[in-house]
Amino acid sequence: MKKFFLTLAMMVAFMGVVNAQGRFEVKDMDNFKLHTYYTNDPMGDAAFIVETANGLVTIDAPLLKDNWEEFSNYARELHKHIDYNIINFHEGGDPKAATMRPEGMTKFMSEGMYDSMMKGFQQNFGDKMLDRPSGPSTEIKFGETLNSNGVTYKFEQAPAGGFPGATIIIGEKIRHTHSAPNEAHITGMSAPNAAAVDVAIDDLQKALASGCELFIGSHGGAVNKAVVENQLEYLQTVQRLLKQEKTADAFVAALKKAYPGKTGEDSLPQVAANLYK
């Protein structure tokens, strides 16, 4: 996890600030709607609004002021009260608003590596970044369920090795994690060692067993079940080749052969170095 923080901070420092030109995507889940906001910020963040007939819930609202302006203006146009602001993995949103967080995240975000990362963002983004949240914070214990206007939010403990946030099952139809499954090769940041691949496979299997229709992440946005199935098959291939190939170079060659043209080949040497160390 320490490597994740360092890599993310370095990425942001080199990329600089991108002015907000985000986009929204809406999914109708019958008794509620999910609004996914792709920020186009340097971190590749996504933020979410769950809309019911009588209110709204935000999840991991944007960190940068331009994005927050787009996001909050959009929310106002829905003409409904925001009942809860959930901070799961990412700080952001109205700094003075009351927030709901998974157990332990209030402390985790205020000290150590997370706090250092946020202070680094403050130095890099300056006045383009919102103040950090200072409003009252209520924590939801793992295994407990929040109910808002008939939509349930079940908080389950996130996989080991990443942020100690929650996997949130929304309305028994949507599964929220830190990063959504995707179609690209894994990166050195997501696979710091072989155990991380095992953890990812286990979590994808849980995702498919959850009965959810949509899988969302504060990085990556919203994807369907087919993307989850494809990533599971891919990671099982990674796991098999890791046992089969004796060297890092042979592993990279075999993975490229198995998935010709797959996005992210440039990351494979670092992935192999991590997995074979």
Predicted stretch roles:
Residues R23-M29, L63-L64, M105-N230, T237:
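Metallo-beta-lactamase
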Residues Y37-N40, T52-A53, I59-P62, I86-E91, ...:
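Active-site-proximal beta-strand/loop segments in catalytic clefts of secreted hydrolases
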Residues N54-G55, K65-T106, S210:
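Active-site metal-binding motif and surrounding structural segment of the metallo-beta-lactamase
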